[in-house]
Amino acid sequence: MFYSQFILAKKGPLGTIWIAAHLERKLRKNQVADTDIGVSVDSILFPEAPIALRLSSHLLLGVVRIYSRKVNYLFDDCSEALLKVKQAFRSAAVDLPPEESTAPYHSITLPETFDLDDFELPDNEIFQGNYVDHHVSTKEQITLQDTMDGVVYSTSQFGLDERFGDGDTSQAALDLDEAVFQDKDVIGSDDEGVPGIDHNAYLDAAAPGIKDSMEGVSEAMPMDFNEEQVEDLAMNNEFIEDAQAPQTPGLVEVPNSSSVREQMACDDHMDVEDLNAEEGIKSSGELNANEMPKRGEDLSSEYNAPESAVTPVEVDKSQIDENVNTQNEPEEERAEHVHVTSPCCSHITTEMEDPGQVMNEAGANVVPDKPDAVPPLETPGEENRDHFAIATEVNQETDSSLQGDEQAYSRPDGQLNNAHETDEQLGNLTGFTDSDFPPPEKVLAVPNRQGDGNDFMVESTPDKEDPGTCNDDAGNNNITGKKRTFTESTLTAESLNSVESVGLIQSKRTADSVPDDDDLLSSILVGKSSFLKMRPTPVLEPATTKRLRSAPRSTATKRKVLMDDPMVLHGDIIRQQLTNTEDIRRVRKKAPCTVPEIVMLQRQALEDGLFKEPIFTGMSVELVSLHTEPYDLRGIMIIENDDRHASVGAVEDNECSVTAVEENKTEESSDPQAHPNDCEEQPGTAHTHPQEEQTINQQEELKDDNELAEKSDLEVLKEGNGAADEVNLVVIDDVSQIPSEEKLDRVEDLQVEESHENHDGEGGQDVCADPNEKSCTDVIEIAEGDTDINPIFNEMDLKVEDELPHEDEKTDASAEVSELGRDDQTPCDNTVGSTETGCLEAGDLSNMALENCNEPLVEANSDGLNPETESYNKYEPHNEMSNEEASMQNALDGEHTSRDGLMGDNDEMDTMENAHDTGFLNVDDDEVDEDHEEDDIQYDDETRLLENSGWSSRTRAVAKYLQTLFDKETENGKNVLVADKLLAGKTRKEASRMFFETLVLKTRDYIQVEQGKPYESIIIKPRPKLTKSIF
């Protein structure tokens, strides 16, 4: 393959192409954008230097990938641009009726001269009707047509209802001339001769200048009321409900500690009074003109009083409605008294107690209201009655041009004609509380929905509604001129949530609809009104703890879900899944917690190995180790000499060298027993008995100690008459661990040597093993022969305290005597007699010692593991040598522990040696280097090879470790190590480090590694370099 290096260079013409073919993810977007596909293809087709076919194919693949990346980038950019365009021109989903899809031009277009600073209250020409305001809707849209000629109403919408402006500006409309109301009283008078009654003259209690304007109102109010004329008030209790003042007849004063706005919301709930009272006054003409000034003064004083309480008014109805009601209506069916709450007047206390003078003294306090449909009380012939209402607000102005619906209710007797004229001048106020309505600004922001019929307001539930009167003029029944109260503009969180979420607000506009007075801003800017309708609150479904399904359950058969469809999880669903996972929680199995449960679980995992485990639980570690310890009984041989004695000879491997003699009274036993001989106190020699001379006369050996108790263990009697005589019992340790017969030949003539000094200062005598003599020596010495390898015998100095406090007290010597034969898995019990490797004698025993029965008794178990010491002498003084002997015993134990790893065969030796000598495998190189810095200084450069100067500390440690093992193996006659034995019991980390360092030594030709077949044991052999080097 030949090509120019410049072609595939990083800045070459095809460098990016080659990267795209092999390392597509390494390309950046700017690299893809800068690549010219045409130029690249031409460079491949017509290269400067010949290109191999394989390279050209790779380059073409890179071109294709770059082109694909470019297409993807372009597609993403186009998709993003299209999405932004759609979002920019996307219209909100507004549910508008067809006729309101487009708004009139003048409703959505502001005049060029519109300026908020130009909003000044006009002069008196407002009241003369000569002022034209171009910033409001036309007069035809906001004014109802009435039949009265000459009545001029102001078209101004400015007043207390507008929300903008300072306090002085909002109160400016209250400076009304008294003549305006007086003229309206004359115009609105009836042909009955009663002076003109202007119901718009009821001003709010907080309005300034109300005292002067109340004089015209007081003249228009009736003086007397009878019980029959207000009987309909009992049927309209729902119209009298007030959120701040409870409707309690006995409640005289209810303090209102709320704010001014809350008092305003309370005050706009008008008292309801039957219109028949006024009609009765008009028809009867019973008006006491002399009491009118008094009532005017009372009314003015009541309005000037602070608004802190709402007082119920007890009205005498005995003189009301006697002319309006039908002639055949019984009077006894009418209500006697009605307690009417009057929230717009505050302190009416003592004047209310006299029913006969209620209206004479506080006639202005009874404010009538007109509901939509108020049926008569048990009167079949009376279809309907006209009511009137005066809506007032505390911080609002009293508009002299209130608009009202033309309610043409039919009356058979024709007695309510004047009431129609009154209704045309007054705005009708419904009898429900509209405190749940949001302000018009929020209502305008709600999308318009199709209204249901003519019911835009709260669906009231009149007691007895006459369908004939309400449905005949359904088109004109809209309360378009109603003044929205301040409570309607007050919005709570609950009402807002219910309005916006459930969609209870309904808006309806008709051709003759007129904006409300308090919705001035919307009438100026938009030109539409916000008539409201509330539907009954739907019944909430009970909440369930289970998670709702994201998709409805389909009864049809399952079909394959298209994975291309977008899967969208709503935020509420994800939040619910994060906060509550009860429905997806699964019941878990009970895990074993107690010890028996865990043991049972472990036993189940054992399967077949269960039969090899003990059935008892909770055993100590010692018992478990004894149970798990393997025993090899193949090398044990028992030789019976006579009926009373069983002498166990040396096994084929010559594994034990303990002489034991059993008494006559005992049964056949293999427990070794050491006994004193009947010789003088002069020193004797230790005997090495061959196998054929194992028969010993029991009577001669036990002639002086027949009084001793039977012992199946090793017994040593000691003299205890106060002298510091000691019996240094040297037990031949684990000769059974000698693996081969070659070792037996070397140690056949081992001699026992032990130097000892008594506490009295007597020196021990050195004796040699002599098979012809049976004299007992004070000290038994065992020579190791001509080899220096693993010491075969452990010397133990078993000492017994001369005095123990109690007879039953025992001293456990297991802490002082090292375990014998533990490393060799074959125990030493059942082997007595002298072996070819050594003998055991007890010496320095006098006749007194043989006769003393109170001497301490030293018991050694047959396996040499747990010797027990018992003292039967309670009166002898404490031997001073006891502490010294114990310390000596501990020292011997440590010596035994360090040696016992080398006393068995090669397999066991490796196991024990590695457990103690391979700690360097767990040490890092840095720590090992610090330890060996001083060691390196000791050696001269001439004594070590130059080749291992650059080795790591761990490599040197492994080489030294192998060198030591090979030296010991050479002494044993072997020159081979098995890797499996070296790595037995090691962790994975230690084994890996050992294996690596072995390979290093093999590479440097320090060792030879062989493996005959795969998966067989690896054999390690030393090389001359290893034996000559010093590490």
UniProtKB/Swiss-Prot annotation:
Record keywords, A-Z: Cell cycle, Cell division, Centromere, Chromosome, Chromosome partition, Mitosis, Nucleus
Location of the motif Nuclear localization signal: 545-552
Gene Ontology BP terms: cell division; centromeric sister chromatid cohesion; chromosome segregation; double-strand break repair; sister chromatid cohesion
Disruption phenotype: Decreased sister chromatid alignment along arms in tetraploid cells (4C) nuclei and impaired sister centromere cohesion, associated with a high frequency of anaphases with bridges. Slightly slower development leading to delayed flowering.
UniProt xrefs under Gene3D superfamilies: Structural maintenance of chromosome 1. Chain E
Subcellular location: Nucleus; Chromosome, Centromere
GO CC list: chromosome, centromeric region; cohesin complex; nucleus
Bias (Basic and acidic residues): 742-762, 803-825
Tissue: Expressed in tissues containing dividing cells such as seedlings, flower buds, flowers and inflorescence meristem tissue.
Presence of keyword Cell wall biogenesis/degradation: no
Main location group: nucleus
Sequence segments annotated as region (Disordered): 461-481, 661-703, 742-772, 803-835
Similarity comment: family membership: Belongs to the rad21 family.
Subunit (UniProt): Component of the cohesin complex.
Function: Involved in sister chromatid and centromere cohesion during mitosis.
Listed name of the protein: Sister chromatid cohesion 1 protein 4
Organism: Arabidopsis thaliana (Mouse-ear cress)
Lineage of the species this protein comes from: Eukaryota, Viridiplantae, Streptophyta, Embryophyta, Tracheophyta
